[in-house]
């Protein structure tokens, strides 16, 4: 068996019976012959299957529920999008079940939460945050419609994607920094996840477009404040003095700004996502606004459309066009190279 919690489908396959018969054994065993009941019960014991009482109650009550998986709970952007999604889905008459995902080594959301929500027989699943682009997701979802928000994935048969145009977003960042006289622009990356890879690639292309390929420098960090702080602190300790830091997201930028402050060094800093903290006066971070309101509304509508028209031919990917919010953090006069 794969390294995951066995499902009623696994029990049925192991026992050589239908899923409905397994359900009947669990709900009303007196209606099943002793021979077939014993076969199902043996499979349940061998596989270690535990009936999901919540799922059975959902099915029995015919409730309309949608599961929302949240990754990177430390990032306010995820919560901002989730709140808009909740409002939209509840207004459409659905219950919303939230699940907090475990992030492994910065790789993004795994499949365990998707599997658990599918077992609950939800009508659809919406994932907020970076998600691995792997075939295992399709297996975990089964036939459940799903929308991935802010993800580096491509839409598949029963999925759709709502994301930010990172190519334009990082283009705006580099254009702004170059226009301010910065040529040595270091990218503080978001780690090894799919969104981090997209933004790093966009940084490379934007630098090349400005004829700055020789000035390209990437510092491996991560999506958290601590990761940004440690990466920039190590960069400065090595004796390097970048004119500007284009960071993966706002939290990473906050950490970068802290490292610069502690070292007594000035450099232009930009973030990405424009979370509410970025506008505070003492921070005043220049950031790419990914419009969490529009993204949340668009992703909820996309999921509802996918649920109602699973075989329909329509655009299964929407991209929000970002804008750059310029604040004091990027207005630092560049040092001479």
Question: What are these language model-derived features?
Answer:
Residues 1-64, 334:
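N-terminal helix-turn-helix DNA-binding module of bacterial transcription factors
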Residues 1-3, 61, 65-175, 236:
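Alpha-helical recognition/docking segments in bacterial nutrient-uptake
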Residues 18, 64, 123, 182-185, ...:
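Short acidic/polar active-site loop segments enriched in Thr and Asp
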Residues 35, 147-151, 164, 270-272, ...:
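Generic beta-sheet signal
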Residues 53, 71-80, 99-108, 162-172, ...:
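Hinge/beta->alpha junction and helix N-cap segments in small-molecule ligand-binding domains
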